[in-house]
Amino acid sequence: MNTRKLIVTTLLAAMSCTPVLAQNDKAEPYFTPEEMPNMLKTPLTPPDSLSAAFSYDLSRFLWGKSVRATERGEMAKADAEYGLQVVCREFAEPFGMEISKEKTPEIYRLLLDALPTCDEISWNPKNHFMRRRPFMVFHEPSLKPEDDAPLSKNGSFPSGHTILGWSAALLLSEINPDRAEAIVNRGYLYGESRVIVGAHWQSDVNAGYLYASVAYAKLHTSDRFLKQMEKARKEFKKLSGKK
């Protein structure tokens, strides 16, 4: 089992064992990793260290460090948390509704199954490239030093946090398109936070947005996903009073 798969499997196991959740709250991805698009067959790769793209990575890293002591830095530090619970917490305001198993069970179910599915698209590239993270290259702690040791064993390209946040933004925008601008903005910032923390390069984050979009498109080829999305949309309309 590769490192990325081990991390995600552990996360899902923890989610399924949380007391507040029932037994049927274990994630059931819509596709296996082998069924997801193989992004290694695309030209998208980490930039060469002598390229203009990497120069941009460096400039964005320095920008990120410059805002760590600001309110934006505090947001980035909070965004270092990973998983369904942070999605429910951080996207509730832009989505316009509390997201939880109790209040929105169909939306929650959709996210529980869809987000791990989208993450699968990153496993092979992360292990193939094993790109070193900024805090490793510069031999200095990130904004979340307690995360550095486990992250150092996991490739930087693409950003898994960005895939999580952008996938969530796309899914929630489909459920509530009237709030799409606010939802997508939060998804973008969640990815950008990884640059500020120093856990990812900007090119990792940019790749994460693209990977998530490809995974999101793949979801729509699953009949089970489409049925659950319809349930989620109906639930939202009922709770929000929209027709």
Identify the meaning behind each predicted range.
Residues 189-220, 224:
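Interfacial helix-loop-helix junctions of multi-pass membrane proteins
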Residues 17-18, 174, 217:
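Residues in and immediately flanking transmembrane alpha helices
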Residues 3-4, 160, 203:
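Residue-level micro-sites within transmembrane alpha helices that shape
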Residues 14-15, 171, 214:
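Alpha-helical transmembrane segments and their juxtamembrane interfaces
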Residues 215-243:
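C-terminal membrane module of polytopic membrane proteins
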Residues 24-197, 221, 228, 239-240:
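Hydrophobic alpha-helical bundle signature of multipass membrane enzymes
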Residues 1-23:
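Bacterial Sec-dependent N-terminal signal peptides
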